[in-house]
Amino acid sequence: MREVISIHIGQAGIQVGNACWELYCLEHGIQPDGQMPSDKTIGGGDDAFNTFFSETGAGKHVPRCIFLDLEPTVVDEVRTGTYRQLFHPEQLISGKEDAANNFARGHYTIGKEIVDLALDRIRKLADNCTGLQGFLVFNAVGGGTGSGLGSLLLERLSVDYGKKSKLGFTVYPSPQVSTAVVEPYNSVLSTHSLLEHTDVAVMLDNEAIYDICRRSLDIERPTYTNLNRLIAQVISSLTASLRFDGALNVDVTEFQTNLVPYPRIHFMLSSYAPIISAEKAYHEQLSVAEITNAAFEPASMMVKCDPRHGKYMACCLMYRGDVVPKDVNAAVATIKTKRTIQFVDWCPTGFKCGINYQPPTVVPGGDLAKVQRAVCMISNSTAIGEIFSRLDHKFDLMYAKRAFVHWYVGEGMEEGEFSEAREDLAALEKDFEEVGAESAEGAGEGEGEEY
């Protein structure tokens, strides 16, 4: 069995996690109390969904995940929510005081008290697996817990489970909308360890997803629930091939192999199509070609980043529902002829496709229409460099004046860590430039040696 353990850290991680598990349960027909009427074999069957759920002797399905936060309010919502009976109480870990938007509190002072407990619970989950495949880590890097405790946990996971792949779903600060003044500090410090300790990081940001909700779903004032349900659809499409059977299944480690040309360049754009409200869906065809084109639209990217400003290095398309390989090949061929979608010259083919026959499920009373087929795209583009340049610029403006730095130093950090993280990101920006620029013949004598 190829199990996957999900780790939800901090408020963003937990709320996205809630939306994900709600959707998984609907997809598999698992009730909020963990019972699954359709599953006849009691005990750990060999069903595909057992990658995400473990089964007890009483026939209850328990998610393989932990929820981790430094303060109790958000975890308490899970403890009292609709799915409270789904989770084992030990899977919900909360501390007493929060990280106060401070990376150093999450990483050093308060985080380190709780991290051993979390690793202990993860160890229990891992012991329950026959062939653990890897971890999905959900966090945001703007706050204190997601960034600080998230980095700490990833570092410790690298030590304990060195060879297992780690996929991150990371909410980055948006260009215009901000929830904390010190976001640039937290995200730069956190990205410094994401670079080292995740194999693939899928970037998300709230502003981009707000815009998608407003534009495509006609929601005037989107809430976090709207955003999270959209993110859950993306994550569900990514993991569908682990949880269901299909024609071209895609494994967690396969993402890495196909999307990461150089170890450091592993930050991905994601998009999903069709994002459409029920009123509109009734009048549209939404063929494979249409949804494939929609997935490449700059406006459907889940992070504020225009892929037309860079080149694609690799691209993964996961289709689900009523899709046959012939349609996919035709759609991809059309995409390749478009001049707007450019690939780097050293990666001519660049497409990995997966098909899953399970049609997309929607949350009843949610915003998305029930459709016959959908596609989720994860792509590695040099345009992602923009996001880091944007962050670094904001970081520099504050750090030049050493604004707010004393809060971090007071929690036991050293100023050197700021400059070290910032230099690491400067190197990353440079990596993106080189990868976009280096052509097949120039790679020999250029900066190609450092990889």
Curated annotation (Swiss-Prot):
One of its GO terms (cellular component) is cytoplasm. One of its GO terms (biological process) is microtubule-based process. The modification N6-acetyllysine is found at K40. It holds the Pfam family Tubulin. The active site is at E254. Undergoes a tyrosination/detyrosination cycle, the cyclic removal and re-addition of a C-terminal tyrosine residue by the enzymes tubulin tyrosine carboxypeptidase (TTCP) and tubulin tyrosine ligase (TTL), respectively. GO terms for molecular function: GTP binding; hydrolase activity; metal ion binding; structural constituent of cytoskeleton. It is found in: Cytoplasm, Cytoskeleton. Its EC number is 3.6.5.-. Mg(2+) binds at E71. The record marks Y451 as: Involved in polymerization. It catalyses: GTP + H2O = GDP + phosphate + H(+). It is an enzyme of class 3 (hydrolase). CDD domains: alpha_tubulin (cd02186). Keywords: Acetylation, Cytoplasm, Cytoskeleton, GTP-binding, Hydrolase, Magnesium, Metal-binding, Microtubule, Nucleotide-binding. GTP binds at Q11, E71, G144, T145, T179, N206, N228. Its cofactor is Mg(2+). Belongs to the tubulin family. Tubulin is the major constituent of microtubules, a cylinder consisting of laterally associated linear protofilaments composed of alpha- and beta-tubulin heterodimers. Microtubules grow by the addition of GTP-tubulin dimers to the microtubule end, where a stabilizing cap forms. Below the cap, tubulin dimers are in GDP-bound state, owing to GTPase activity of alpha-tubulin. Dimer of alpha and beta chains. A typical microtubule is a hollow water-filled tube with an outer diameter of 25 nm and an inner diameter of 15 nM. Alpha-beta heterodimers associate head-to-tail to form protofilaments running lengthwise along the microtubule wall with the beta-tubulin subunit facing the microtubule plus end conferring a structural polarity. Microtubules usually have 13 protofilaments but different protofilament numbers can be found in some organisms and specialized cells. This is Tubulin alpha-1/alpha-2 chain. It comes from Volvox carteri. The lineage of its organism: Eukaryota, Viridiplantae, Chlorophyta, core chlorophytes, Chlorophyceae. The gene is TUBA1.
